[in-house]
């Protein structure tokens, strides 16, 4: 989930609630708040916590609509180097009532020395959190991407503390191996990569959790729910999503904010703290416009296939 800002560059919590409703209306099964897309490295602790709390509050209000299952809300805000500060920010996040607190993989064994050191650091962190706290882990690309080695995945599967992994390895065969390693553990795997989304689903991933759901979540929702029932159409949808996902890097999240303003009637500043607003050129805006045109056309072909 992105963080919308006011023109004075403070967090726009009204727009945050509008975004939650938009994800709901587009069929999303859950929201990852206070994540990298939320620019957590550039938010104060107060805003990291308030962002997750606001998202959870709005999702709970929407749950009164019994026409569909409640959206899960997970959140991280895990950015500190110091161990005590990590415990503080994660405990405060747990207090918001989110369904799971997400540990960022590069915050354990920060010097990236070994799998054993990572496991020891993560175990120490888990022991400092309330025992009832549901946790996930996320291979966040910033400040550097710490991919989970096999030994780390095996430990996660056996620990009994983890609910899921947000996978950013961007390698379908590696995802397949991880899914096999997690089998029977109850730990789910959500893939963040659009290019491997369909292939990963075929291997048994539990869904897609990535930034392109800020542009065309309906297509991902449809594919995740229907790829087995309509395999031929799923291949076509997956191919379109794969191509669209190549737009995820340039000037994001400004591109997503441009999309929300122009196409989703959610007003917010195009300002971002992690990307230069000036870099959102007409060229990049045209990418978003063309992507919207193509994805709307695809959705018209699948909207009645349920």
Regions found by a protein language model. Name each.
Residues 63-66, 156, 181-182, 263-264:
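Short, conserved catalytic or adaptor-binding loops enriched in Gly and charged residues
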